């Protein structure tokens, strides 16, 4: 029977069940991360390979874009920047980074765009979008013209596109902003599945910055009307969206 008692490797670091123990900390993330940590992909990957101890006296500090605390992290700590937002890594501030940029920086950077963080929640639906259920009928399944689900007014170009498209035919807006269906939709994917098109604008146009917006549209079997990443065709079939 294998012992579960901690030992030490040649560097003096604790080893339990054949895994090295790493002390980490998350800062400058969204406020609900502590409650969502078990489902956070970075944490899931770490736990596959290490015994993870979350503490203030950390050796590795993961930080994001929701604050400035990372500037006061001691130099002895390894700082790892992770982002799903339209913010490029600053390698003067971090040792390693996980982001969306198309770049090669030896072992200090890995490209992992935003939509990959959604893993099993939407990617399987996107990958099997052409596998239609038996007796599926376009006329009965796609009763709406175009869907639009947003919660704020901050993207002026997106808002203008919505109003312009509404001049042609009604766009069903099911979010908190510009809602015209009488209620806020609870199941975004189910709502969008009823539509032929979906209006999809990123928060900014930057090479590599492709978020879940495009992937969700494919998962709902809609044709995205897309604006954002100018190099989106490196990954996605440009003939599949407008």
Language-model region placement:
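Nucleotide-sugar donor-binding catalytic core of glycosyltransferases
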Residues: 3-242
């Amino acid at each position: 029977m294998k012992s579960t008692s901690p030992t030490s490797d040649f560097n003096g670091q604790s080893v339990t069940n054949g895994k090295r123990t790493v002390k980490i900390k998350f800062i400058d993330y969204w406020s609900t991360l502590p409650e969502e940590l078990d489902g956070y992909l970075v944490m899931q990957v770490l736990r596959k390979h290490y015994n993870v101890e979350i503490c203030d006296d950390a050796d590795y500090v993961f930080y994001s874009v929701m604050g400035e605390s990372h500037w006061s992290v001691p130099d002895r700590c390894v700082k790892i920047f992770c982002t799903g937002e339209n913010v490029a890594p600053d390698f003067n501030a971090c040792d390693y980074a996980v982001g969306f940029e198309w770049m090669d920086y030896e072992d200090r950077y890995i490209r992992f765009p935003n939509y990959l963080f959604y893993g099993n929640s939407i990617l399987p639906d996107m990958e099997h979008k052409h596998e239609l259920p038996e007796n599926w009928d376009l006329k009965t399944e796609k009763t709406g013209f175009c869907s639009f689900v947003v919660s704020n007014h901050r993207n002026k170009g997106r808002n203008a596109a919505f109003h312009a498209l509404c001049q042609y035919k009604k766009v069903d807006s099911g979010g908190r902003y510009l809602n015209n269906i009488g209620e806020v939709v609870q199941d975004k994917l189910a709502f969008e599945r009823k539509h032929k098109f979906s209006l999809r604008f990123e928060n900014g146009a930057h090479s590599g910055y492709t978020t879940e917006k495009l992937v969700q549209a494919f998962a709902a079997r809609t044709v995205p009307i897309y604006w954002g990443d100018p190099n989106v065709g490196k990954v996605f079939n440009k003939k599949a969206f407008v």
